[in-house]
Amino acid sequence: MAGKGVGTPLSALFLLVLLVVTIGMMEVQVAEGRMCKTPSAKFKGYCVSSTNCKNVCRTEGFPTGSCDFHITSRKCYCYKPCP
């Protein structure tokens, strides 16, 4: 019977730690959030290099950018966290 008294607090502690870790992971996912996509206003031509696209997007005030397909061509799109 003494073993049952010791196991219960340890099980409760384990579940509490598991809950805290799970909640912590959920907060990180929410903090990352969605990224909003906007066509670059300054990038000209067919987008081949995402590095060039990213650099142009940074001059437009966006943290990043990449070449993405748009219908039949590749265009430069800039990304920022959605409000």
Swiss-Prot record:
Function, as annotated, reads:
Plant defense peptide. Has antifungal activity.
Listed A to Z, the keywords are: Antimicrobial, Defensin, Disulfide bond, Fungicide, Secreted, Signal
Biological process (GO), any one: defense response to fungus
* CDD domains reported in the protein's UniProt record: Knot1
Compartments (UniProt record): Secreted
What is one cellular component GO term in this UniProt entry? extracellular region
Q: Which SMART domains match?
A: Knot1
The family database entries (Gene3D superfamilies) matched by this protein are listed as: Knottin, scorpion toxin-like (3.30.30.10)
Q: To which species is this protein native? A: Pinus sylvestris (Scotch pine)
Instruction: Please give the Pfam families that the UniProt record associates with this protein.
Output: Gamma-thionin
Q: Report the family membership.
A: Belongs to the DEFL family.
Q: What name goes with this protein? A: Defensin-2
